[in-house]
């Protein structure tokens, strides 16, 4: 599953290699909410995991996960804030407990988004991609960026949504992404 508001800055091949190496039924990506005043509220209302780049293998266990998820989404896929569901994504928080054999993608270059942008700094652009520093210490290659909350206000104006989130942002990184 790939969310429609994402852009790939480099091939996800090494993310697939990570997933294949884990022999899992499915993979999910953490929101990676920054450790700030809004973290616990974001986790409670939006869930630990983001529906953006979910991988499923053609196995019986994977089909069980997909069938259960589909059923839950038919029951409620509301974006109204509550503690039970949020669209199609809060259900992902139950996958590890319910099904096991779920891999949480470790590569921090996958899943960069407005809500976690304050934890990233632009390190540089090289011939093979854009490199970031995650949480001040980990060098990662940008795989994809999730353009959530992008709004066209009129023909010439776009609200990019990154300043709606708490935390200091790297302007050079924002300029590179947008």
Sequence positions of predicted segments:
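Glycosyltransferase catalytic domains, chiefly GT-A lineage
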Residues: 1-178
């Amino acid at each position: 599953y790939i969310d429609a508001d994402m852009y790939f800055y480099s091939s996800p091949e090494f993310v697939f290699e990570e997933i294949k190496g884990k022999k899992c039924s499915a993979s999910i990506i953490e929101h990676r909410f920054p450790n700030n005043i809004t973290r616990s509220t974001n986790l409670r209302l939006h869930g630990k995991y983001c529906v953006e780049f979910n991988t499923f293998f053609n196995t019986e266990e994977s089909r069980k996960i997909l069938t259960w998820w589909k059923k839950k989404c038919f029951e409620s896929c509301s974006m109204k804030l509550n503690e039970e569901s949020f669209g199609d994504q809060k259900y992902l928080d139950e996958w590890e407990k319910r099904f096991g054999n779920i891999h949480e993608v470790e590569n921090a270059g996958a899943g960069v988004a407005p809500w976690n942008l304050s934890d990233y700094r632009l390190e540089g652009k090289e011939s093979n991609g854009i490199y970031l520093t995650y949480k001040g210490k980990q060098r990662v290659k940008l795989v994809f960026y999730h353009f959530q909350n992008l709004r066209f206000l009129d023909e010439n104006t776009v609200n990019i949504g990154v300043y709606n989130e708490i935390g200091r942002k790297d302007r050079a990184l924002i300029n590179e992404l947008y």
